[in-house]
Amino acid sequence: MSLLCVGVKKAKFDGAQEKFNTYVTLKVQNVKSTTIAVRGSQPSWEQDFMFEINRLDLGLTVEVWNKGLIWDTMVGTVWIPLRTIRQSNEEGPGEWLTLDSQAIMADSEICGTKDPTFHRILLDAHFELPLDIPEEEARYWAKKLEQLNAMRDQDEYSFQDQQDKPLPVPSSQCCNWNYFGWGEQNDDPDSAVDDRDSDYRSETSNSIPPPYYTTSQPNASVHQYSVRPPPLGSRESYSDSMHSYEEFSEPRALSPTGSSRYASSGELSQGSSQLSEDFDPDEHSLQGSELDDERDRDSYHSCHSSVSYHKDSPRWDQDDEDLEDLEDLEDEELPEEEEELEEEGEEELEEEDLEEEEEVPDDLASYTQQEDTTVAEPKEFKRISFPTAAPQKDDKVSAVPTEAPEVAKGIPKAATPEEKAAAERAQEAEPPKSEESFRSREEEEGQEGQDAMSRAKANWLRAFNKVRMQLQEARGEGDMSKSLWFKGGPGGGLIIIDSMPDIRKRKPIPLVSDLAMSLVQSRKAGITSALASSTLNNEELKNHVYKKTLQALIYPISCTTPHNFEVWTATTPTYCYECEGLLWGIARQGMRCTECGVKCHEKCQDLLNADCLQRAAEKSSKHGAEDRTQNIIMVLKDRMKIRERNKPEIFELIQEIFAVTKSAHTQQMKAVKQSVLDGTSKWSAKISITVVCAQGLQAKDKTGSSDPYVTVQVGKTKKRTKTIYGNLNPVWEENFHFECHNSSDRIKVRVWDEDDDIKSRVKQRFKRESDDFLGQTIIEVRTLSGEMDVWYNLDKRTDKSAVSGAIRLHISVEIKGEEKVAPYHVQYTCLHENLFHFVTDVQNNGVVKIPDAKGDDAWKVYYDETAQEIVDEFAMRYGVESIYQAMTHFACLSSKYMCPGVPAVMSTLLANINAYYAHTTASTNVSASDRFAASNFGKERFVKLLDQLHNSLRIDLSMYRNNFPASSPERLQDLKSTVDLLTSITFFRMKVQELQSPPRASQVVKDCVKACLNSTYEYIFNNCHELYGREYQTDPAKKGEVPPEEQGPSIKNLDFWSKLITLIVSIIEEDKNSYTPCLNQFPQELNVGKISAEVMWSLFAQDMKYAMEEHDKHRLCKSADYMNLHFKVKWLYNEYVAELPTFKDRVPEYPAWFEPFVIQWLDENEEVSRDFLHGALERDKKDGFQQTSEHALFSCSVVDVFSQLNQSFEIIKKLECPDPQIVGHYMRRFAKTISNVLLQYADIVSKDFASYCSKEKEKVPCILMNNTQQLRVQLEKMFEAMGGKELDAEASGTLKELQVKLNNVLDELSHVFATSFQPHIEECVRQMGDILSQVKGTGNVPASACSSVAQDADNVLQPIMDLLDSNLTLFAKICEKTVLKRVLKELWKLVMNTMEKTIVLPPLTDQTMIGTLLRKHGKGLEKGRVKLPSHSDGTQMIFNAAKELGQLSKLKDHMVREEAKSLTPKQCAVVELALDTIKQYFHAGGVGLKKTFLEKSPDLQSLRYALSLYTQATDLLIKTFVQTQSAQGSGVEDPVGEVSVHVELFTHPGTGEQKVTVKVVAANDLKWQTSGIFRPFIEVNIVGPQLSDKKRKFATKSKNNSWAPKYNESFQFSLSADAGPECYELQVCVKDYCFAREDRTVGLAVLQLRELAQRGSAACWLPLGRRIHMDDTGLTVLRILSQRSNDEVAKEFVKLKSDTRSAEEGGAAPAP
């Protein structure tokens, strides 16, 4: 991707001024940009546009359009090929291009233009160049260019030519060979954006590294801009060089710091503090003076060294000879031993398996930790791998280039597991590109064979794929997870289900904290010392720093003599030494030092900080006052002697730090003292100052702007820049040179606003400063060394000054005698690092000694008193800022960040560093990132340090249980501080670096905690048996060795899971009680205890689910074992997981795992319950069904049965299943168990119940009925306990159905029990009948006779009352209320029915036999009841019985004999009164049956209705019969023939008299057999009220032997005018005429006249039935009428309705 910058400047058009209103459009790669519209023939736009270009074979289309009223017209166009556009980092003056009028098209794309116009446009287009490649790399490319130029015999090209050539497009780094560790020399280890911290990068750079480097340079405040021009060379050659290098690059031996051959570590030039040690030139590195020589060479701005080419790039088809030459050249450069090692490495990689531990050489380990930040996967964690110790937040895998060198220092190195993992992730991120790129490169090699490098790449790919497969297997990605469950184990015996498992929490065991893990960590904690302590081995630098330290400490600034100022009066115009302003006033104008004579304003005296003694000595020596000088020198000598005598420990410590011998130290002390005495008299330096630019200046002009310029003064020499008009962010780029001979001088840089108005001219007359002051910065010369590029904040001069902004200066100082030394900041770094190394590693065995300091500035105290004084005095002497000191100490501590107490110190340090940069003051508006960029420590260096520290902290937090054991309060405090440090790093990235969305510290820690928990779970899972035995096994007998195959999960037992739950609980408890209070910085976002529970449960749930599925297939354990495990899992979930936000509103899965086993247990439980039921009933039977207690009316079998059921239900209930669906399944199954058990109980009781009733023991049947009722009561309670209305619908239905069945059983038992009293009741009622028959009197009873009626009623009731009284009293005592009411109901029915049948409606004639027959037909005595509203089969049954016995005909004779027992009205009154008494008795004052029930009882109503019928007239009874019996002839299923009749109904209009005319037409299909002649005739009867005086019957003539006779005879009946047709009916009867005997009935039919009431007439076929159908009401009317022997109409009616088809005789067959 390249950045194309296009500036549209102006244009010149041929035409009138007013004709044009134009705008410009730019099109490239489907992107279009447009300028504003400008009027005139010479418009000026001055607009810049930027495009991202990834194809250089296209072009930029520029079109100029003229705006119109309706549409726009094109003025002209020009097409610029992208290849022709120059590369530059600066804007050019632009180029005038002629516009053409037409575009040339090819394949629908513009490829040029034609037909020029007279219009022209000024455009400036250039590609941006990459910035800041390391100087070393620049020299390398320059060297390559020279070699290629020599090979091709080409001379230098001009720089302009070079600019005009296109820059090849660099490919994305996501697709280069750094994935596989090749071409690592192309990778810049110091690139901040290309850092390997994937978590950090994934949120800041979208996982795509930028195409160019931004490499840090030594002592750089901002970037080190090159001040030398780049070397001239062929752009073509340069491109080819890049191409070839990419194609044939080979792995190189790495330097000890891990920096590559050509890409410097970012700190190599200018005596860098990052230089680890001197290099040998043969090993492609720099040493000694060669470094200095190289420093003078030209640097070159190169593009990113991993540039690759597309096939359509301009130089793709270059001749191959260049490439071959380069290949030969590079082969020569590769040492032989490296080639051999390459081959060895290939073999090793092919044979290598993924091992548990790998030994890495120290230097390589150092390299790996510094440069390759891929995280070493802890060996004991086999389930998970976390590349940066924290899982990615999204599914994208960051494409992080991973360096994997094959050789270092001649030692072969195989790929470490970390690198394999990184390679795997990279391969997963972009496998297609990598393979395609690899294939394309292989094709380029040709068919002859591959060179060594290509073979190495192929081997790498093979090894990588192999490792990738192994990693997949190791992670269990194959189908191997289920094999876990096929391991054997001891079987468990039957145990009682423990619904409250005792998961022991007696102590939070440090399972993984203090116990040795299965493998040791391969990575040492701490950032590599190569980064933090780069100066330890630089002896030359150390020697120089040693001298400078002595110099700073022998006469420290803190001991300098202050000026002795006094008020002074100037006699001549005098100027302030500090601000150079005139000392105004007549007298006492300023201050003057009595010792050295310096004069200044009163306000400026504090700005003069030079040592008065040294200043006096300098002044005296210059003016020849030797005596005075000698005095001062003596004072200085004395002071240094006193210093040395009073503070000997300081100089001894300095000697020990730099390991200087005693004699050498003594000599050096003398030399240092002499240099101090010499002061500045022999000191001189050349200072070069470049005023680069300024930002954020104050606006002083009325226009809201300023015209700034800068004055620079060193000593008395003052220079100024040019003025930049109207700009608050001016750029000057002006260089000034000074010579300085006084180290106490200061550089005064002041910014002014130039004014050229009258006011300023007047001001100039009176003041030396006519311009407005914009700010200043004062720089001590003695603090300068080497080269510096620094932003300085502009300071005020007085309190009234309005100042803002900052100025950037590039300062180069060459001090005489110190031309080649490092800058003072680098020297300070050397001092600090060596001091830290000495105090920590030498004196304290690697443990950081933390000083005891308090107060606001405690963070600035890094060592104890002596060492702290050394660094402070050095910093003060040489101008090292306190923030630089802090950053340096932070870098030192980062190498020991795992030492006790260090994280807290680092956290405080970084917090103060953050505050320094992020908290801007009112005096400056420079952003935090700009302030940080101006840091002398080096922006990139510090960012990289933080990135690597961040990465390492994440790794260690991902093993917090190891690194910060809960048993150590000190380490827990370190853990807390470590998180604080992470938070400070995040704050730094957000506020100082100003990154958009750095990873939140809380999220990072959360990911680390999860990673640690993952590995902890894996560890306890794999070592469950051993850990449990060690911590919890108290029984020595159980501590025996268990075979390895039985230590894991088994399908034969469940012990493993119980132990695992115990261990999980201990882990969660440890996190909850130890780590949660410690990591409390993010209360809303991070709770370690909750995360622990969540992760542990998630992993446990996954394994448990698979295990239970496996167990479900085999079922080798007892159901009780599964239930016990279920309770433990339930407890674990409820105790730790249920309230977690993730699971709170979710139905957990664990009940589903155990559902089949719970159902199995319920199945088994039903069998147990049934066996228990039989046992309980047998015991109860033996005991005689005794009451369980005095107050309980039921026996113990009910209690036993429900105790067992309740226990079973309690177990189900205690499962507390949170899944409603599964609860429903359990309830359904348990409801079936309840139903089966209780119904079995009821069946057993029902079978034997009758036998208990037959004995003269009323108590046992009552107890059994009470038991049944108690079943119903307990069932209702259980229904409520199971959920009541909320219970599953199916289970609820089962229990309700069971309740109905038990109710029916109770009804049946009550009926059976009551029926056992029937013989006694019948006997009593017969006695009542006999007493009633003796009651005399007819007609209605007068009021005066009421008392006699009551007396008669009492007499009549006497027998039944005696029976009821004796029994009901007993029942009330031994029956439950519900049972008692049921028994009373049955007895009530029995009494009522018996009275009705025996007294009110006695049976016809042969009562006993008819009663017996009725019972035989299954209807019992109750069939005689009157049921007014309903129809039943009672009538038919009676007639059937009568027919079978031939007794119905006796009904016809009934009235002839005097056997009928017809009740008189008085007797009816007595019966009525007796009924009321019986009713009151059964009500029993509310204890018995309810009055409403008794009143509405159908039995009572039937009896009363029968009594009421006794008092009704015959006509009324006949009318009732006709109106109620509407189905006498209907429903004839088996007709015996049919009769055709025509009926007409006529009403006289005057009298209202009604007549019915009946025409008998014919009969048909008569079914009759007779031995004689068949003579059918038809008889028609009219039935109804008030017909006693009218003719009621007609008959036709008979027909001989005709089964379908025709009659056509008409008859007329007269009806009463008082009753309507609905009260009458016609009964048609077909008979066989017999001469000598009674006619035989063939069939009967009834036609009710109500059907003709509307129509008036009807012709119809009437089917003939065998008898008349009637209900109980009809039968009752018939029986009452049958007792009226003196009533002809009644007798005739009874005979008519009781007639049935006669018996047939065998004879002739019916006619067809």
From Swiss-Prot:
<dbReference type="GO" id="GO:0030154">
    <property type="term" value="P:cell differentiation"/>
</dbReference>
<keyword id="KW-0268">Exocytosis</keyword>
<keyword id="KW-0106">Calcium</keyword>
<feature type="binding site">
    <location>
        <position position="596"/>
    </location>
    <ligand>
        <name>Zn(2+) 2</name>
    </ligand>
</feature>
<dbReference type="Pfam" id="PF00130">
    <property type="entry name" value="C1_1"/>
</dbReference>
<feature type="binding site">
    <location>
        <position position="612"/>
    </location>
    <ligand>
        <name>Zn(2+) 2</name>
    </ligand>
</feature>
<dbReference type="InterPro" id="IPR010439">
    <property type="entry name" value="MUN_dom"/>
</dbReference>
<feature type="binding site">
    <location>
        <position position="576"/>
    </location>
    <ligand>
        <name>Zn(2+) 1</name>
    </ligand>
</feature>
<keyword id="KW-0479">Metal-binding</keyword>
<feature type="region of interest" description="Disordered">
    <location>
        <begin position="185"/>
        <end position="454"/>
    </location>
</feature>
<feature type="coiled-coil region">
    <location>
        <begin position="321"/>
        <end position="360"/>
    </location>
</feature>
<feature type="compositionally biased region" description="Polar residues">
    <location>
        <begin position="203"/>
        <end position="224"/>
    </location>
</feature>
<dbReference type="GO" id="GO:0016082">
    <property type="term" value="P:synaptic vesicle priming"/>
</dbReference>
<dbReference type="GO" id="GO:0016188">
    <property type="term" value="P:synaptic vesicle maturation"/>
</dbReference>
<protein>
    <recommendedName>
        <fullName>Protein unc-13 homolog A</fullName>
    </recommendedName>
</protein>
<dbReference type="GO" id="GO:0030424">
    <property type="term" value="C:axon"/>
</dbReference>
<keyword id="KW-0597">Phosphoprotein</keyword>
<dbReference type="GO" id="GO:0005516">
    <property type="term" value="F:calmodulin binding"/>
</dbReference>
<dbReference type="GO" id="GO:0016079">
    <property type="term" value="P:synaptic vesicle exocytosis"/>
</dbReference>
<feature type="binding site">
    <location>
        <position position="701"/>
    </location>
    <ligand>
        <name>Ca(2+) 2</name>
    </ligand>
</feature>
<keyword id="KW-0472">Membrane</keyword>
<keyword id="KW-0221">Differentiation</keyword>
<dbReference type="GO" id="GO:0042734">
    <property type="term" value="C:presynaptic membrane"/>
</dbReference>
<dbReference type="GO" id="GO:0005509">
    <property type="term" value="F:calcium ion binding"/>
</dbReference>
<keyword id="KW-0770">Synapse</keyword>
<dbReference type="Pfam" id="PF06292">
    <property type="entry name" value="MUN"/>
</dbReference>
<feature type="domain" description="C2 1">
    <location>
        <begin position="1"/>
        <end position="97"/>
    </location>
</feature>
<dbReference type="GO" id="GO:0010807">
    <property type="term" value="P:regulation of synaptic vesicle priming"/>
</dbReference>
<dbReference type="GO" id="GO:0031594">
    <property type="term" value="C:neuromuscular junction"/>
</dbReference>
<feature type="binding site">
    <location>
        <position position="755"/>
    </location>
    <ligand>
        <name>Ca(2+) 1</name>
    </ligand>
</feature>
<keyword id="KW-1003">Cell membrane</keyword>
<dbReference type="GO" id="GO:0005543">
    <property type="term" value="F:phospholipid binding"/>
</dbReference>
<feature type="modified residue" description="Phosphoserine">
    <location>
        <position position="244"/>
    </location>
</feature>
<dbReference type="GO" id="GO:0007269">
    <property type="term" value="P:neurotransmitter secretion"/>
</dbReference>
<feature type="modified residue" description="Phosphoserine">
    <location>
        <position position="241"/>
    </location>
</feature>
<feature type="binding site">
    <location>
        <position position="753"/>
    </location>
    <ligand>
        <name>Ca(2+) 1</name>
    </ligand>
</feature>
<keyword id="KW-0966">Cell projection</keyword>
<dbReference type="GO" id="GO:0045202">
    <property type="term" value="C:synapse"/>
</dbReference>
<dbReference type="GO" id="GO:0031915">
    <property type="term" value="P:positive regulation of synaptic plasticity"/>
</dbReference>
<dbReference type="GO" id="GO:1902991">
    <property type="term" value="P:regulation of amyloid precursor protein catabolic process"/>
</dbReference>
<dbReference type="InterPro" id="IPR027080">
    <property type="entry name" value="Unc-13"/>
</dbReference>
<feature type="binding site">
    <location>
        <position position="755"/>
    </location>
    <ligand>
        <name>Ca(2+) 2</name>
    </ligand>
</feature>
